[in-house]
Amino acid sequence: MGKLRRRYNIKGRQQAGPGPSKGPPEPPPVQLELEDKDTLKGVDASNALVLPGKKKKKTKAPPLSKKEKKPLTKKEKKVLQKILEQKEKKSQRAEMLQKLSEVQASEAEMRLFYTTSKLGTGNRMYHTKEKADEVVAPGQEKISSLSGAHRKRRRWPSAEEEEEEEEESESELEEESELDEDPAAEPAEAGVGTTVAPLPPAPAPSSQPVPAGMTVPPPPAAAPPLPRALAKPAVFIPVNRSPEMQEERLKLPILSEEQVIMEAVAEHPIVIVCGETGSGKTTQVPQFLYEAGFSSEDSIIGVTEPRRVAAVAMSQRVAKEMNLSQRVVSYQIRYEGNVTEETRIKFMTDGVLLKEIQKDFLLLRYKVVIIDEAHERSVYTDILIGLLSRIVTLRAKRNLPLKLLIMSATLRVEDFTQNPRLFAKPPPVIKVESRQFPVTVHFNKRTPLEDYSGECFRKVCKIHRMLPAGGILVFLTGQAEVHALCRRLRKAFPPSRARPQEKDDDQKDSVEEMRKFKKSRARAKKARAEVLPQINLDHYSVLPAGEGDEDREAEVDEEEGALDSDLDLDLGDGGQDGGEQPDASLPLHVLPLYSLLAPEKQAQVFKPPPEGTRLCVVATNVAETSLTIPGIKYVVDCGKVKKRYYDRVTGVSSFRVTWVSQASADQRAGRAGRTEPGHCYRLYSSAVFGDFEQFPPPEITRRPVEDLILQMKALNVEKVINFPFPTPPSVEALLAAEELLIALGALQPPQKAERVKQLQENRLSCPITALGRTMATFPVAPRYAKMLALSRQHGCLPYAITIVASMTVRELFEELDRPAASDEELTRLKSKRARVAQMKRTWAGQGASLKLGDLMVLLGAVGACEYASCTPQFCEANGLRYKAMMEIRRLRGQLTTAVNAVCPEAELFVDPKMQPPTESQVTYLRQIVTAGLGDHLARRVQSEEMLEDKWRNAYKTPLLDDPVFIHPSSVLFKELPEFVVYQEIVETTKMYMKGVSSVEVQWIPALLPSYCQFDKPLEEPAPTYCPERGRVLCHRASVFYRVGWPLPAIEVDFPEGIDRYKHFARFLLEGQVFRKLASYRSCLLSSPGTMLKTWARLQPRTESLLRALVAEKADCHEALLAAWKKNPKYLLAEYCEWLPQAMHPDIEKAWPPTTVH
């Protein structure tokens, strides 16, 4: 049976029976006759005669039939149960919506989402801002939101008529749920999300006639179609990849984002791609662009990397994946490259692209430039992004679009997207998922402060002995720590060299060794137990005994039971540690990895380990982002990093071991889990990790920027402070850089100003000089570029190029101060140190060459190595780094090419059999080095100035208050010259000068006048005139700036002022400036020395001649010739005043007297 329908308002519609209705009865109508025969109709309540005689009986309506309640059936119970559940859901809806609103994405994020249902349908998944505005009006975006979720939909009129009646089964519970709804729910729900106004319903078609007098508005006219740009034909370049390589590519997360990335590139000039390490962005995005035709028409896809290792490795990997030759996918780094005319994808370091911008500012050969690893925020990366932001705009105006892709491994892109000076319109950001497999991060319960290297060793031993197969990657801080840990691990787990027939014997030996190891470990524990411990009461809790024991027991159980949680198992301390015992049954393939390692040794980490061994790579932060090592499952992170810090003012550099940032720690953890779920073991607690800075500071804020300032000035960026840096350097760093460049002669001095603000602006906008443009062409630091620019004379260029190349490439000699692992190694290191010290003394020589100091050692080492054909055997025998020597060779070639481009007549070439310099050339080289390193001058502390013992054998520098010392490895360590210049100061236990060369005191005011404060010209010796230079010279004493070191008087140009004009007039009258006037000297009416007398103004002839010289600023030979070129009769009248009247006609005929000089 169907359900009985309950009619609407059934009680009100029920009709009464025959009985009287409820309420007072109506009186019967009565007619009364009056005396005037009229009748009065109605009821007169006051007349008792017309009242009814008796009360009528009331009849009650029959009562409504009441049905007896029947017991509910199972079906009805289910229906009621559903209604109760619905009511419960409605009561909880407000709370649920409130919680959802807290985690709801914003509208800006919602617009970035796309649907995968349109894949392959031809519809765009990524719309530009302009097209979005055309389709949807502002404020009418229909975004899926929780806003208005509590409201009912608007019902059509027809639906209202059809649903007048409700089902009877939903009677009481339904009415309660509708009427007794929580009044607080509506405002709570109304506040969730953003309210979207509902669209007005379309008018329903009606067949009713239109009433008279009403006009029907005509339908709106269709909008004219918008003009659409002509679609360009799609370009697709086929790539023949191998099936195996294609299968590997499909596993990368970025492959699913190819359409999104390419649509964004097509619609926007600048795109930011964020994908953590391992997502494949470095290798796949260039391939996307290549297949889309961005390398057609002889164009190039440029990819910049911050490190040379990454540029070379990535070019080889992409060429292998695309099955193309390295003539098509090439690389270019500082010293080498394989770029050809066929190159279409070019990997390079950021410095190489910056040099290309100097030659071709618009980069016309490039269609796309990719800035990779932008999260590292290297100096050149920041400069490139600032320059490319303007180049993209200029190329767009010329209808030659350039696409810029910025790829970052972190989501720290606010410096790019929220920097209106850099990008006026924020570029779109595309997020790419990274890892295919999860990485579990484990923290230590305790943080080792000192012996983190030993903690790394113990952790690796535990992982290797107890965890399943998988490569191990260990992060340490420096080269010495890497080698020390490698030696310990190789000693603990020596590689197995057994033959197959010896396996059984090895197994027996390993079992016997394990048994002995357990016995020795037990004895060691017993021995440690017998030693009375030293109890420190500060290590104990103040809680009463028993309190907190449960927690401690739980921690012990957790430590022993859950290996994956911490691996914090106690293996003992010191020499008794079981990890130090050799265990040949568990071979470990240990490899080092750091930036100074030879390339062939770096490539070994990418090869599979020998069969039966586990790969363990001990690396510095070079393996943090640039390289992905295959097969790594476990990462051991010490949490430390060694950074070079520079003092902006003093230039002192120091290496400090500090904590990494949280972003760097996450990058290290990302090295695991490439092929399977991985684990990262951090040797610090989670509380320490919480105190890390979120991101490392950009490099441009931590180092001197004079080389960048010079390069930008060469690009005609005069006001560097207005450059669109992603993170601008401090004003102090900019001022220090410009002061150095002014002292080097690369920039013009700032113009004088009356206001301080204007003076500071002038100091930050000094124009570049001709010398500065020449220096900018050399790919070295400004100090070294000044040395190259000054070394053209006396045949010093080949030697200066070699010295500059050696100073640019760091760490020429091997690090021999590392700790030895055995007595044999200690003996070998001692003998090698002695040999290297002897070779340094040999290369330094004696006499004049020894005064060149450490730079002579560099020159001799490079010359000897080149003479021996630069073989690895020679480098190993003499303690030289083969990789450094090869870099010097390449840099020498590059600098020689640059010098020949600036000075073609030099005709330089790299001579492998270069002869040692002569004594005179060594002297010139010392002067050249002094002129380039003038701000790095130091003076030995004299005995009378020595106030404390710490100043013994110390030197004083202008910018430091503390003593500095010559490094013990220097050949001048025992010589102790009075004045030296140094390459750099490195702070360790003391401040040591490296790259030291001796300086003669009389050279300082002549070569470094900008650093000296000169006194007034000396009267004795008297000023003289120099015919070669055409200037007035004098002797002046001076002091070195800031420290006031007294310097001897030297002959310099006479200072500007009225006295210089007086001396020049005197030499002019004497005939020293122009020899033709010397014949008239005996006929002068007054002595030329009258010009210098205090009473000279009393004579008209002296005053008129002086005024004429000052008016044309003629204080030298060159200025006087320029004045006569403008006016040949210049000074004729003034000179005639000094001669008798009879000689005036002869003077007028011979004027100007420039025929003989």
From Swiss-Prot:
This is Probable ATP-dependent RNA helicase DHX37. It is an enzyme of class 3 (hydrolase). The keyword Hydrolase applies. The lineage of its organism: Eukaryota, Metazoa, Chordata, Craniata, Vertebrata. Keywords: ATP-binding, Cytoplasm, Disease variant, Helicase, Hydrolase, Intellectual disability, Membrane, Nucleotide-binding, Nucleus. Residues 459-716 form the Helicase C-terminal domain. InterPro entries: DEAD-box_helicase_OB_fold, DEAD/DEAH_box_helicase_dom, DHX37-like_C, HA2_WH, Helicase-assoc_dom, Helicase_ATP-bd, Helicase_C-like, P-loop_NTPase. Changing L467V: In NEDBAVC; uncertain significance. Residues 499-515 have a biased composition (Basic and acidic residues). Its main location: nucleus. Changing E167S: In NEDBAVC; uncertain significance; requires 2 nucleotide substitutions. Part of the small subunit (SSU) processome, composed of more than 70 proteins and the RNA chaperone small nucleolar RNA (snoRNA) U3. Interacts with UTP14A.
